[in-house]
Curated annotation (Swiss-Prot):
Organism: Halalkalibacterium halodurans (strain ATCC BAA-125 / DSM 18197 / FERM 7344 / JCM 9153 / C-125) (Bacillus halodurans)
Membrane topology label: Single-pass type II membrane protein
Residue ranges crossing the lipid bilayer per the database entry: 11-30
PANTHER family (UniProt xref): THIOL:DISULFIDE INTERCHANGE PROTEIN DSBE
Entry keywords, A to Z: Cell membrane, Cytochrome c-type biogenesis, Disulfide bond, Membrane, Oxidoreductase, Redox-active center, Signal-anchor, Transmembrane, Transmembrane helix
Pathway: Protein modification; cytochrome c assembly
Disulfide bonds listed in the record: 74-77
A Pfam cross-reference name: AhpC-TSA
Primary residence: membrane
GO biological process: cytochrome complex assembly
GO MF entry, a single one: antioxidant activity
Name of the protein: Thiol-disulfide oxidoreductase ResA
Family per similarity comment: Belongs to the thioredoxin family. ResA subfamily.
Length: 176
């Protein structure tokens, strides 16, 4: 009987530990921890672009803002950047601005990436990850669509096709 009791006791302990680990894994990796939600005002920030110019989100009120959080080490980020560049000129004329927020990488690494893809939209580096933390961004890429009134319209996590980028830009294009 002693062996049987020990077996069930060990099995019970193992089950409790497994459930605890499973819950921890789920809450850390799958639960929506984003602080940015559709219908809320976008959090203001000021970051410098690669030319040293300050970009403040609040100053873009009146325009739709396509706020993309990315990293050079992120394959989906790398795939979506050419789509964003392709549509940037057309939608900039219609009142949509792209701001690509890099996740704290060295400026030289980011500049090489920008040069390789010929990106012309503003690229800023979130040194210290303050903006990423303020928006609760996990994982990369994440794109936040902000309308001309500074309100978050949509939060998209994951890569985007060219069609998705175009649909998202249409969604935040200011009304004429």
């Amino acid at each position: 009987m002693d062996k049987r009791k020990r077996f069930w006791m060990r099995l019970s302990i193992l089950a409790v530990i497994s459930v605890a680990l499973g819950y921890t894994f789920y809450s850390n990796f799958f639960a929506d921890r984003s602080l940015a939600r559709a219908g809320e005002q976008a959090v203001n920030f000021v970051l410098e672009d690669l030319e040293g110019e300050s970009i403040e989100l609040r100053e873009l009120e009146g325009k739709g803002v396509f706020l993309n959080f990315w990293g050079t080490y992120c394959p989906p980020c790398e795939r979506e950047m050419p789509h964003m560049e392709k549509l940037y000129g057309e939608y900039k004329e219609q009142g949509v601005e792209i701001i690509a927020v890099n996740a704290n990488e060295p400026e030289l690494t980011v500049q090489r990436f920008v040069d390789r893809y010929g990106l012309s939209f503003p690229i800023v580096i979130d040194k210290g990850l303050n903006v990423i933390d303020a928006y609760g961004i996990r994982p990369l890429p994440t794109t936040i669509l902000i309308n001309e009134h500074g309100e978050i319209v949509k939060v998209h996590t994951g890569g985007m096709t060219e069609q998705m980028v175009e649909e998202f830009m249409e969604l935040i294009k200011p009304e004429a």
